[in-house]
Each structure stands twice: as C-alpha cells, then as structure tokens.
Amino acid sequence: MPSAVATVVGMNDMTTLHDAIGDFPRRKAQTLRFSCGAPRSATAIGDGSRVLFLRSDGPEDLVTSLWLSVFDADGTHREVLLADPRVLLADADDEDVPAEEKARRERAREGGSGIVSYSVDAAGRRVVFTINGQLFLTEIAEDGSGRTRMLAADGIAAGEGATPVLNPRISPDGRHVAYTTGEHLMLVDIAPQWPSGSRHDDATDDDCDGQLPPHAHGHRCGDEESGAPYDPSADKLSTLWSVYPDDDADENTWKIGLAEFVAGEEMDRYDGFWWGPDSRHIIFETFNAAPEPMWYISDPANPQTPASGRRYARALTSNADVRLTLAELAYDGHDEYAGLGIQQISWNRKDYEYVAAVHWSADHEPLLLVQNRRQTRDQVLSVHLGSEASAGSAPVGSTTVLEEHANDQWLDIIQGTPAFTPDGRLVCALNDMDADTNRLTVDGRPFTPAGWQVREVLDVTDEDVLAVVQRTPELDGYEAPDGLSPWRGNADGHDARSFDVVSFDYDGNVLPMTARPGSWSASRRGEGLVVSGRDMDSAKSVMSHSFTMRPVDGGAVPENDGDGSAAMSTLVCPIDNHAAEPGFAPNVRFARLGEHRLYTAIIAPSADSPYAKADRLPVLLKPYGGPGFQQVVFNQAYYWDAQWWADQGFLVVTADGRGTTGRGPRWDREIFENMKDVTLADQVEAVHALAQAVEELNRGTAQDGDASRIPAPDLDKVCMIGWSYGGFLSALAVLDAPDVVKAACAGAPPTDWTLYDTHYTERYLGLDPAAYERNSIIADAPKLARPLMLIHGFADDNVTIAHSLRLSQALMAAGRPHTFLPLTGITHMTNDPVVAENLLTLQRDFLRDALDL
C-alpha cells in the first residue's frame, strides 16, 4: 500500500526539509500549485504515433504552448513545439480574455493562459485554438513540424457581431471552423491555399456587418454573391444562426452555442455545439436564461464599478430553457458555405429538461442523454437525420428512446456515455444498486464486473471500452482468466483511492493500462496511448506516450523499456515535465477508521520539524467531505498543503466519509436528503477512532528517534479547515459538534442550500424545501460557542458571498463573535497568488490562538 515519509526531493537550492516546507506557500503561489511547466490536455491523434499536448516553458510560466509528441518510423521519439503564443502574439503575456471565456475557464477550473484548449480534426492534421480572443490554425506536416496562422483575422475584427471568439471547434474533415460569440454561431471556411504571409486578412464588404435577423439563416460577409471573386487563399467568415438580440433592451437572455451554467458547473458539459462526423451537420444549443433569477456580483472595493448582473439557476427555482437544433450545411463547388437548413430537435423537454450529454460518432445518428429535473430518470435518445420525404421515415430532428434508466435517489452522469460502438451497439452507464456497482452495459446487458466502479469512459471500440475505474475489493468477485492477473498481485493498492485506466472487453475481462496506484487518465487512438496523472512516488505529474510499432522491412520491434504504465505497448517514452517540485514528499500514512471503515490519510510532521518528536499534537481535520469528490487518493499533490500544516504543529487528518464516491452507489446515496448530519457524523467518527489507528500505525516503531513514529493525537484540541463543501463542514462542526471540534476556518461555505444551483443541490436534497432547511446552517448560528473564521471572495459566482454574509449576519444577530475575511476580486478558485499564500498563514495563526497553542 503506498505511503511516504517526508524527505527532501528535487530542491538543489534548499538544504533542509524544514526550509522547503516553510517556503511552500510562496512557491505554491508562484507556480500555480506546481502545475506550470507540466504537460497536460493530451490527445492521441492519427495512428497513435502522435500526441498533442499543452505545456508552458517553465515552473513559473503561465503561458501554455501547443506541443506534439512524435514517434518516427524508426522508433525515435521527439517533442515538437507547434505553436508558441509569445511568437504568435506580442501581447500573449497580457491576456485580455472575454467575459464569456473567463466564465468558461471558471467552470473548468482553468488557471493558465496562452493556449488553454484546442480542437483537432479527425485526421490529426489541423488544430485550432484562440489566444487573446484571436483565432489560430496550426497545420501539422508529415514530418511532425507545424505552421500556424490567424484565421479570418480581418473578417473577425471588422464584422460586427463576429466577436468574441468562443469555443472554436474544427470540423472532422478539417475544412471549416465553427465558433460562437454567445449571440451568433459563426463559420470559417479555411482557405485551401496557405496565404503568403503568416497573417492573412480576409476580404469583407463595407456594408456587411455580420448581423442576422433573429433565428434567420446566415450568409457570408464578402461572398461571391456580392461580387467578390473566389480567392483560394482567403478564409471566408459566415454567420450560421443567431438568437434573438432584441428580447430585452437591457439584457439578451438568449445564448447560442454555449453550455448553460449548470451544464458546465455540474454536468462537466462545456460545449454548446457539436459537429457531425460528415462535417455537414451541426447540433447547436440555444438557451433562454430569462426564467432564472437575476443575481449581481459586486466589487465593493471599487464603488465606481457597477455590479455585474447574471442569471443563476438557484435551487428550487426555474432553470434556463434549453433547446437543441439540427443544422445541415450546404457547400458550393469550392467547399465554401452556401446556406443551411435547420430543424428543431424534439423530445419531451417538459419532463426531461436537462441535456446531460451529446455524442456523435461516425456512421451513426447522434445520441442525447436527457434527465428529468429530479435526476431520478433519464433517457438515451437517437436523433433522426433522414429525409422527411422518405416513405415511412421519422421526421428530421425527431428522437427515438433507446434506453431509459431510473433510481429512487439520483442517476449519475458518467462522462463518455452513452456511445455507440463502431458496429452499432449501445454502451450506457448503469447504477446497479443490487451489485452496488457503477457499471457499463452494452445493448442493455451489464458487462463490467461487480466491484469495478466506472468513473469515466475514454474510448469505445468493437472489441473493448477504455475506462477510468476504482475497485471496491470487498465487492470484487472478478476472477481473471489464466495469464491475465490484474496488477500482478498488486490489487490491494487498487481500491477507491486509485483511479485506474483499464480495458474491458464485452465479456467482462479486465486488462489494466496503468500499473501503479494513482490518479490516471488516458487518450487512445489507433496503436497509440497516452497516459497522464499522478501517484504517490513522484512530486511531478506523469505523462507517458506509448505506441505499438509494427516491424518494417523485416526489422525488429524495439523492446519495451518503459515503467509498465502502458503494458501492452512496445515503445514507451515519457513526455518532459518542467514543473517545479515542492522539495519534499509528504509524511502520510493511510488507514481505515471507524465503523464505516473510512479511507483516511494521516499526515505527521516531517523529520526536520520541531514537532517531529512531540508526544502528542493537536488535530487538524482537513476534509472536503461532500458528495462527488474524494481527497484520500494516491496522489502526492493532495497532501502537500497538509504537510505544511503538519510542520506548523498539527497532526493532519483527512477522512472521506459517506457520499465521497469510489465505494459504490449505495455509499454515495447514504447522504440523500441528509448531507448535514451524515457528513458531520463521519468526521466525528474519524476523530473518535483516530487514537487507536495511530497506535496501530506506530506498533513496532521505537518511541524516540524513529522518523516513522506518529505523535499521538490530542483529542482535546481538534480543529477543522475546508473550502467549498469542506468550508460548510468546518462551520457545521463548530456549530453542531463543539465538544469534538474546538475551532474552524470555513472557506467559501455554502451555508444556505437554497442559494446554491439546481442540478447539484437538487440531486442530493430533492425538491422538498424542508430538506433544505434541515441541511442549511444559518439557523444554527445561535449555537456557536467556538472560534470560527469565515473566508469568502466577493467575485465568487459559484458559491456567492451571500452564503457567508448571511451566516455572519445571523451570528451577529445572535451576539456570537466570529472572524470574517472578505476577499476582493477573488472567485471560487482563490486565483490571486498573494491571497493564496497569505490565507495559509492567517488561518494558521487564527487556529493557534483559538486552541491556545
């Protein structure tokens, strides 16, 4: 089972472990949590011998570039810089990001700059992305080199309504790019000839402003019909479709091509339009946010700045009105846009208002996953594309129900499902309550084994499904066939704490793609696989490109000399990581605590800490503790903050209670309509079981001088810190369990669940207002008898500062002293490096004073 004792790692300029840990807050802030310089966002392309990825130049460089990992025909591996934002734009370091793009990045928790996302065509030859609102195209040559230019630069700059450029997606054939401005869905026809200069200016008509009548089909700015001659080196910009810009004089509540707020925040669906595999069809979303309440985010430190208003899907109120439209594009002889036909996609929107997923694979009709408001029922729908004139055929845009699912509490969304296999079988997710397993089905038949919790589907073929899974060993009845032993006897380390990439065939056989327990994901194409993630052994994230190379002209295939992270591949090469390291490995032990056998991490002071040989230490509980997210995982980065806290003189404990996923659908649903009581009870259970667990971990170690010995917990001095749900749990602990938790720091706590969004909150609390009253903590304010610090950002549009303000107001009304740190300009991500650094020390000093340390 992975564990670690704190040691000095990778810090040539620091001679002691104590120095490295002491400098951690500053270095964490400077390096964007040690992520700068690390490769990320990998996509295998072509035959799998190539992988696209993003990476900045160094440990403090926020500007990410586009790179290519290449295996040449002789097996040589190279990394090729395809597009550098600083070369393409002089002001790449000074980002001017549109408000809509900032919102998308906030939903995706994106903290970088430069090229932060990209779209690639089916052949892996063309890639599009934005930098500072400008649209760029990179073409990849046979030798792996690339050339990059702006697309439709003058047309986008000059056309009214053509900006901002949001979510550009290249067509599968690589000839067109669609993007949205929020009000217009735009199309760029890529010139077949590369312009002579690095920047190409698109010709436009002076009288063409890019505007369209509401919901009228588009036309080209500067097209041939207006007299402009065809130019094979000129990109053409067209408006495909627009939403109503004049519904409201002050606010356009209609949006096109964007995902509504709850889709991005809670469903992990960030796209609002989808190309068809034939590059002639597009499904696009339009939504009207007018039914949602209007909320305002203000900046009190700058009273001259007006408050920013936006619609917010508040729990127990109305959602946005979401619609889908199918567009069929026509092209002329030059493969340039010549018009379109559209048809609304019809389904039972009244009963199934959430569009959870859209998936469209080659040679098949598009698939939709729609949910009812309570998320207790869903439908998998196919969208009909055929001609209305065909005898007996269903109308274009109509849908057919392929599968339906139900659950008394809620249904989980498993990313990557539903999906067709190439030969037409339907792969769906199943919350199998009888087997207590989140499984996959093919044409309605479960085929993944019991005890293997599927978290995400990465790829679907006729032979297998590539997926991210967590094992529940106590449920796992799977017996590997002869010659196939998952993890070769290392299965005990692969449990709820490990996110493993495996291949399932449709008979339920399992082939692991990752060898070490950790937090892994992957992308697969052809004979290539790129695996990325973290484990407990390395401070840096790992990205490994593997490719099965066939012998050429009788030559031998090189032997696999990799680390086993992609066991079935022949060639394996790591992708360089230029990130900084914190300079220490955390001193963490893992245990199972209490009646519920809670997965728990216990982090003790490092060997250099003055507290290393203490007999006993105060306890710092550091949970998330809420539904849908785990913190006790085999990922070293999860424990760096905890190690800093341990070296301040605390025994740090993180326990994953009921609802935190990874242990089956029953475990997840034990919090239903009772999050408050259940999640707090599990933290209290962990405290009560802690002393015995530490005794057992120390059994066999010397009492003095042994670095592996853990100081005993001082259960009279227990405190808690947390952010988001962890902040809620921290405030709740000093309100409802003051005999156990004696002080708390609560960051961005959702104190009143009626102020949080629909999709998340109603999944766990349902639609009964009484459940919200029971699970909120405002009414508990008069019970406060322990020190409490509230921390909240004014710019937080996810958990708004109203949560902390309402609790503070109730505490004031009850005469209960407390501390409140309002953060100007800070969102839910705490993205200011100075604030992030100082928050740690301010919380430390508060807790030391509160516990009289």
Predicted regions and their residues:
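Mobile cap/lid helix-loop segments that gate and shape the active-site cleft of serine hydrolases
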Residues: 682, 742-743, 748-786
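Short beta-strand/loop motif that positions the catalytic acidic residue
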Residues: 784, 790-792, 796
